[in-house]
């Protein structure tokens, strides 16, 4: 069974309700059709009911099993307006402003549904930037208790791969934090390890990546990773984590044994922590395009309730996969 099929089966074991607010995008409607046919999740589509149904019919998609919520007519909208004003009153939000936002920005409406318990999670980003997707989450849902940093990872599945967990990796942070400091990098490592264990159901082995392996190069950028590794080890003494490593030393056993003999992580890593967003973003796209890897994400970690982003280049199948992943994250909060 393919990895994403395992995730789908786990999603089906305890059905969750997921909001898809980007109903103006045909990929969303195609994904909704597939999700409903496969029984992966209950769906809420946000938008004008007539317009959504018309678009679905034009695309040949069956969304009859989804709930369509129109903010302009829903009986719950006023309650969302009142709650949004309450949450943002320190920022000076008025009822008029809250109404304007919720009637016209469906991402905010979807997040309010999650906040109020009318949905378990949300997936968006097919036609919005990561910033647009995550802004309402940070304003409304806030961070998970005990978490200071929201970060993002990609779940990477490389076909016919002997490395990682049979080709399964988590790449973090590949979608959100531009240039994390050592403390933030350590937090990203801990969160990514937790996400790997939840989704892959194997023990995480975390490599802190650099252009240096165990002091082979000297630079301030290397020092940052060395310090992050030290902090992460102190904060997570039971976690298999080490660094700094070049990529080959992290995942190839023979190279790891040569460059970092005695390391419990070298050559065995399945969670790869990149030093900055440039490296992480380039890394996941290289794996996706050159190694034909499946890349699901950016999946967020650290938000109080599961809300996930999509690449704007995503396919309908990518959306299906991220909805399944989001459902599994929701199950973990039960």
What is each stretch, according to the model?
Residues 1-266, 271-334:
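Anion-binding alpha/beta catalytic cores of soluble intermediary-metabolism enzymes, centered on
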